[in-house]
Structures are given as structure tokens and as C-alpha cells.
Amino acid sequence: MCDNSCFCENKQDTIDESLDKTCIFCTIAKGDDRYTEILAEDEDFVCFRDINPGAPHHYLVIPKKHIYSCLSLYADDISLVRGMAEMGRNVLKANNVTDLKDISLGFHVPPYITVPHLHLHVLAPYSQLYKWAINKFRTNWYINEEKTVEILMKGKTQMV
């Protein structure tokens, strides 16, 4: 189990171009999935609703380039994490979420990911997680935005 403070030299490629054709999140990022409504998009990221929401508001923010997971993040990816979080907060505001202190923005740590493409969970209100989701989003296998940035700011090569 990860204690959210460890680092290792995980050799998984950050970007794997071969997955573009088979990764559902790459398909969504390209706008090629007719079943997914894009809620926000910019040059680097897209945001859409989670198909299995764990809270009244549950969105996913993904980078357009294929990045495996939070294990693939390096110290120079802090701006990527912050950009994803900013988009998530903006989507919450656009959906009339006003209490930004009762939210959670975070990543699941492999092996507890369902899609091998980096995705930031945006949950609100965090105090109203659905019963089935409580253990999924309140665990050491779920690392919030602040902790992710804190670990990356330590200047380690790669985060776990």
C-alpha cells in the first residue's frame, strides 16, 4: 500500500502513443466518443462526467496526451496537476457548486485505477459521497491534489 509519500523509479512510460487507438480516455479527449459530453476543454485537458458517480457532482479531468497514471508524474508536472485541478474547480463553479471547501480533487494510485490514463476525480460535496464510494475515495490509494503537489515539490524524480 502506498503511504502517499514514497517515491520510486517506476519505468512506465509517461506518454505511450500506441495507446491512443485503444484507450477510451484518448478517444474521449479527441472528441470521438459520441456517448460522452465534454463539459470543458482547453488546449491540454478535457472534463466530463464520471459514468459511475461517487457523489452528486463527480467529474473527471484528463490530459489530452496519454499519461498512464499518477505514478508517471515527475516534479516538472506540477503545472499539469494544477491545470487539471483548475479546470475541475471551474466545472464545479459552472455547475453551481459554491462550497469549494467541501470538494475533493484527487487521483487513484495503481493498481486501483480502472482506466490506465491519468484522470483527476472532481467530487462535490465531498461530505456527501455515496455509501459505496466512501472507501474508494477515503483511502491511502487515493491521493488528493494538495498531497500530489506536495510530493512533487520535493523534487523527486517520479511520484508514487
Curated annotation (Swiss-Prot):
EC number(s) reported in the record: 3.9.1.-
Domain HIT: 24-132
Record keywords: Cytoplasm, Hydrolase, Nucleotide-binding, Nucleus
Broadest EC class assigned to this enzyme: hydrolase
Catalyzed reactions per annotation: adenosine 5'-phosphoramidate + H2O = AMP + NH4(+)
Major site of localization recorded for this protein: cytoplasm
Catalytic center residues: H119
SUPFAM superfamilies, alphabetized: HIT-like (SSF54197)
Presence of the UniProt keyword Lipid biosynthesis in the record: no
Gene Ontology cellular component list: cytoplasm; nucleus
Entry's localization field: Cytoplasm; Nucleus
Nucleus recorded as keyword: yes
PANTHER family: ADENOSINE 5'-MONOPHOSPHORAMIDASE HINT3, APRATAXIN-RELATED
Subunit structure: Forms dimers to octamers and even larger oligomer.
Family recorded in the similarity comment: Belongs to the HINT family.
Protein name per Swiss-Prot or TrEMBL: Adenosine 5'-monophosphoramidase HINT3
